[in-house]
Regions:
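Acidic/histidine-rich catalytic neighborhood of metal-dependent amide-processing enzymes
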Residues: 149-225, 281-291, 442-445
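Metal-dependent amide/peptide-bond hydrolase catalytic core
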Residues: 33-37, 53, 88, 212, ...
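Acidic/His- and Gly-rich active-site-bordering loop/insert found
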Residues: 33-144, 164-170
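Alpha-helical metal-binding/catalytic segments enriched in His/Glu/Asp
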Residues: 116, 137-187, 228-232, 243-266, ...
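Sec/Tat signal peptide C-region and signal peptidase I cleavage site
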Residues: 28-32
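Short, flexible, mixed-charge acidic loops at enzyme active sites
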Residues: 125-135, 221-225, 289-294
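Bacterial N-terminal signal peptides that target proteins for export
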Residues: 2-19
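Bacterial N-terminal signal peptides
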Residues: 17-27
Length: 447
């Protein structure tokens, strides 16, 4: 049994062979459910109360991304549960990228190498009045992060517990990566996601347990996201002289030109969105990056000297992100007279475009859902999804399947809820899907 102590991660084993190809499924019951699978379903039903208790416990821990003690406390609650299943847990310190850190749990065997991805943090600050788990009705619970994604954490853990209870983890080859800064990535991002990338290089497939606010569905493509900051400068002067050769156009017109040019250039491009979320402009401005707030002052008869705008950029692939960032930078550098501008990005968005291995994972997941009587699984349009850490892992694995966590409504708001019935269904589906995936033949490259 491992101890939850803080240390740096040892390097993951990296496959030296080529792309791993999903092979034919081993023979199983034509009836749809094997005796082992029926035992998994019964175990999940018998332990629904424990699932709700754990969900309440971790929801009542404030794990806002910038609350390192809270993020770490959620990890401390979860780690012993993984230890009890024969996983080796380790805490990866995040001080180098200005965040709390990540919890990884690993169990090595001979089966396909699976990477299960979730996150520990939420968007709700410590002083947010929405701070307590509560029952809304027999099937609905509310609380900060109950849907995104503490319900998903319970699904991951209980699916593995169900498999362990039937002694079905003996050949498991699984890494669970629970990220501590998914909602607001640390910097530099390359360091913040280094261990996840190394885990993805080791893995054959990646499964993302963030959920959705919709019916039973999953995704084989989702967009990556990054943040940007636009800063413009102008020459302060009396407004009667705006546009002349000495004063020029001012910082606000320069910012407006750039943002509107972005809209004109990119609004119609497939799988691409960019959104300014904060804009401050005037004679003097002050911005607090931690609270995402600021102040601005100016007079109607004075040409604005300063503007800062922040927002996000979402693309379906790294290649699309690189191209768009290059063009946005060109636009920002084509200044109006008397102005200057800088445009900074937090990194290149790591999108998750569809690939054949992901399509095969979806087919197996959909087949499993129908075999269990849960009906077909909808394939989600990536435009309906935000960024997630599985997009960082996806380029390195043969197949990736996302959005297989819990369901609810009002996520990232004081109305956030989770559907307990859907958590049970998704747990049964996850446990059975992982079992079937463990028994899938793979064409392995040499290590």
């Amino acid at each position: 049994m491992s101890v939850f102590t803080e240390h740096r991660a040892a390097p993951f084993r990296r496959a030296a062979g080529g792309v791993l190809l999903l092979g034919l499924l081993l023979a199983r019951s034509v009836a749809g459910q094997s005796a082992e699978e029926l035992q998994l379903l019964a175990w999940v039903d018998d332990h629904r109360g424990e699932a709700v208790d754990l969900l309440e416990q971790i929801t009542n821990i404030n794990s806002y991304t910038l609350n390192p003690d809270g993020v770490r406390e959620v990890a401390r609650v979860l780690a012993p549960h993984f230890d009890a299943l024969g996983f080796e847990t380790r805490w990866i310190d995040g001080s180098a990228f200005e965040r709390s850190g990540h919890l990884f749990a690993e169990r090595r065997g001979t089966g396909p190498r699976m990477l299960l991805i979730g996150h520990l943090d939420t968007v709700f600050p410590e002083d947010d009045p929405f701070d307590t788990f509560r029952l809304v009705d027999d099937t609905t619970v509310a609380g900060p992060g109950v849907g995104d994604m503490k319900g998903g954490l319970v699904i991951i853990l209980q699916a593995l517990q169900a498999l362990h209870a039937q002694q079905l983890l003996d050949d498991a080859n699984i890494t669970v990566a629970l990220i501590g800064d998914e909602e607001r990535s640390g910097s530099p991002r390359e360091l913040a996601r280094r261990d996840l990338v190394e885990a993805a290089r080791w893995a054959d497939v990646a499964l993302g347990f963030e959920g959705l606010e919709t019916a039973t569905s999953a995704a084989i493509a989702r967009r990556g996201a990054t943040g940007w900051t636009l800063t413009t400068r102008g020459i302060r002067g009396h407004s009667s002289r705006i546009f002349d050769d000495e004063i020029g156009y001012g910082a606000i017109f320069e910012a407006a030109r750039i943002l509107n040019s972005f809209r004109e250039e990119f609004a119609a491009e497939a799988f691409l969105t960019f959104s300014p979320g904060l804009l401050l402009g005037g004679s003097e401005i002050s911005r607090d990056e931690i609270s995402s707030s600021g102040t601005a002052s100016g007079l109607s008869n004075v040409v604005a000297e300063s503007v800062v705008a922040t927002g996000d950029l979402r693309t379906i692939s790294r290649e699309q992100g690189q191209r768009v960032i290059a063009r946005m930078t060109e636009i920002a550098e084509d200044h109006l007279p008397g102005t200057s501008a800088t445009l900074e990005f937090r990194g290149i968005p790591e999108g998750m475009p569809p690939k054949p291995g992901s399509e095969r994972l979806f087919e197996l997941y959909d087949e499993t859902s129908q075999d269990l009587g849960f009906g077909p699984v909808d394939l989600i349009d990536p435009m309906r999804l935000g960024g997630a850490d599985i997009s960082t892992a996806a380029p390195y694995v043969d197949g990736a399947l996302a959005a297989i966590g819990g369901m609810g409504a009002g996520w990232h708001s004081p109305d956030e809820t989770a559907d307990l019935k859907k958590i049970t269904i998704r747990t049964k589906l996850a446990a059975t899907f992982i079992l079937r995936l463990m028994r899938t033949q793979w064409s392995q490259g040499s290590d």
